[in-house]
Amino acid sequence: MAGQVAGKVALVTGGASGIGQAIAELLAEEGASVVVADVDELKGPEVVAGIEKAGRDAVFLQQDVTSEPRWSEVVAEIARRFGKLDVLVSNAGIGIGAASVVDMSLADWRRQTAINLDGVFLSVKYCLPLMRKTGGGSIIMMSSLAGLRGSATLAGYSATKGGVRLFAKSVAMECASAGDGIRVNSVHPGIIDTPIWGKIPAGATASGQNEPIDFAELARLATPLGRPGQAREIAQGVLYLASDASSYVTGSELVIDGGMFAGAAPRRT
């Protein structure tokens, strides 16, 4: 069914690559005017150019989600250009290399928290008033499978994503109490084929070098479906939550992980 978000205006943070890019492209494909927000001033415009080449509407806004003054400017620009905001996808986030709690630096903990959690808080704080003026909409917060269960050596990341999960539920209840027509949900991807996996070290090898995680093999062994997910598969879930098809869905968790959270399955040889 084409045009599932036709006429809507959507903001996607972290929209220049990976899952964010896939979300921006799919929402535009389905009829939304998309604001691609990202710190990357090279890739962001490229994503927008690709969307426009396909005959769709998009604009790039440079944004550091941890900057409160910039949030005020971004929302003002959206209001000026479009006059409304229907969909907020709080996707921007980072994963810092695996480390035990003892070895993790406070600086890394704070940086991860600033982007993954503070950035989501600021997105809601500044976008919610415009969405209320619009008359309703959908807020989608990107959490993770790591936000549903503990992960050894990823305590900082899991803490931020678990925080996003409960923040989404709290905002959902706040919006429901206000009767503002805004639904709020979180999305929890599992092992997804995105550039971030090439930056996560598996640990020191016999040679003493930190090698990147072999995410394809990890997914084959850890995921009941036996493969990593694709960014567009996450985007399809976001599209559902952004569209009117999910009009009775709020405060929920959409887990898209190939069955990892459900339980164990026989390992493939």
Describe the residue ranges of each PLM region.
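Active-site helix of classical SDR
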Residues: 124, 160, 168
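Short C-terminal tail/terminal secondary-structure segment
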Residues: 95-98, 238-239, 250-269
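Residue(s) in the substrate-gating loop at a strand-loop-helix junction
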Residues: 144
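Short, small/polar-rich loop/turn modules that mediate ligand/substrate recognition or access, typified
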Residues: 176, 181-183, 249-251
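Canonical Rossmann dinucleotide-binding motif of NAD(H)/NADP(H)-dependent dehydrogenases/reductases
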Residues: 3-35
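Substrate-binding pocket helix/loop in short-chain dehydrogenase/reductase
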Residues: 99-101, 105-111, 139, 219
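Alpha-helical segment proximal to the catalytic Tyr-Lys
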Residues: 129, 173-177, 247
